Amino acid sequence: MKTEFDKIIKDKYGIISGNKKLIFVKTGRGGTCYGHNNKYLNLANEISNLYGYSVIISAYPTDSVCNLQEELEKIKSYIADYEEVYFIGISAGALLGAQQGYLNEKITRMLLVNGPIMINWPKTKRGIEKFQGERVEMIYGMKDPSYRYYDILSCINSAKLVCTAIEGADHNFIGMEDILASKMKEFIQV
């Protein structure tokens, strides 16, 4: 397994080159493209090795305002033209995907993990309902602070939405990282 990305762009994007399908992972606020104990680098390598896909891990600096459309436009100059995007968002990255993912027609699937439910809930609900891709999966650890609002997800009017609660998992899936990695691989395969 590689111990580094193929490319690092301004400490914001870690890139593993592959085929025309792109897995775009947006970390939580303050997250780096490597993640704690290289969890994102390892995930990127595993996905690339298993499926041959291109993978970009996008850091979410604490002091930044992110625009998903702008980010997907920026990366075009660093990676070969991609035909399809599977978006994986963690925490604030999940919120970004829920609220803005529908704006990009190349995003065909979204996996949103522990996104803060009550930060601009109407915008989150509207974004999921407008999403025209194949599938949206929202995963919440039952020990995550947002889990107490989990039932409100049933108000989202979308046949493409699947919601999953993971017993024992906290916001960072500490001690359960393998379960989260398994869910991510399952999401990519389906």
Describe these PLM feature segments.
Residues A169-D178:
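Catalytic histidine-centered segment of alpha/beta-hydrolase-like enzymes
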Residues I88-G97:
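Gly/Ala-rich beta-loop-alpha elbow adjacent to hydrolase catalytic centers
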Residues Y60, L111-N120, G141-K143:
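Active-site nucleophile loop of the alpha/beta-hydrolase fold
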Residues K39, T62-D81, Q99:
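Alpha/beta-hydrolase active-site loop
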Residues F131-Q132, M138-Y140:
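Short beta-strand/loop motif that positions the catalytic acidic residue
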Residues D6-I57:
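Short, surface-exposed "cap/lid" segments of acyl-processing enzymes
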Residues P145-D151:
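Conserved alpha/beta-hydrolase "acid-adjacent" motif
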